[in-house]
A protein has these predicted regions:
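Preference for protein termini
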Residues: 1-195
Length: 195
């Protein structure tokens, strides 16, 4: 019953995504499992530390590609693999981004396998999506299982939008910059997140 109730709430909220390959703009509701995946605080602290380290490494990698190119000169990665990539932008060679940060946000997908360890499945750095679903899913969980949030110290996620805004504002030298989100429009599969 609670699964059905949660799915009704999700439908009423318009939490949908476009189906890949659908030419008619077909959408379906965001898949939602009422059984929470519990991550212990000690595990999360280790994961968070690793994710921060990974972001530093990704930024150092990008900076090297657009500056010294040691990773290419030392043959760690073949040059043609980088230069032929859709994401490589030759005009960025020698560019120094604000605060020295190339990649400000990433959707890093994790999996937990049978040995209990977490592994990175992929780094979504070009156009990370999914956080709006996390925020809304948390609200659905609070409505569906209020007793869980009363009985346990569940870490909040609702501060993410303000943290993202502050991150984006920090890129400007203006005292009170305006931040906007550009979207391809309502037929984009992640439009729910853009809106």
């Amino acid at each position: 019953k609670r699964q059905e109730a949660a799915e009704r709430v999700i439908l009423n909220m318009g939490m949908t995504f476009g189906v890949h390959g659908s030419d008619d703009g077909h959408e379906q509701i965001f898949p939602f499992d009422i059984v929470p995946r519990i991550v212990m605080a000690s595990d999360w602290e280790r994961i968070e530390s690793g994710l921060r380290q990974r972001m530093r490494a990704l930024n150092l990698f990008i900076d090297d590609v657009y500056h010294d190119q040691k990773i290419l000169k030392n043959g760690v990665i073949p040059s043609d693999l980088i230069y032929s990539g859709k994401g490589f932008l030759q005009p960025c060679l020698g560019l120094n981004p604000p605060r020295g940060i190339w990649c400000h946000i990433a959707g890093i997908d994790l999996v937990r396998i049978s040995d209990g360890q977490y592994y990175v499945l992929e780094d979504n750095t070009r156009c990370p999506s999914g956080v709006a679903y996390v925020l809304e899913a948390r609200q659905v969980m609070k409505r569906t299982f209020p007793e869980l949030f009363e009985a346990y110290r569940v870490r909040p996620v609702d501060g993410y939008p303000s943290q993202l805004l502050e991150t984006l504002r920090s890129l400007s030298d203006l005292p009170d910059p305006t931040v906007v989100i550009l979207t391809p429009g309502s037929f984009n599969s992640a439009y729910y997140e853009h809106s």
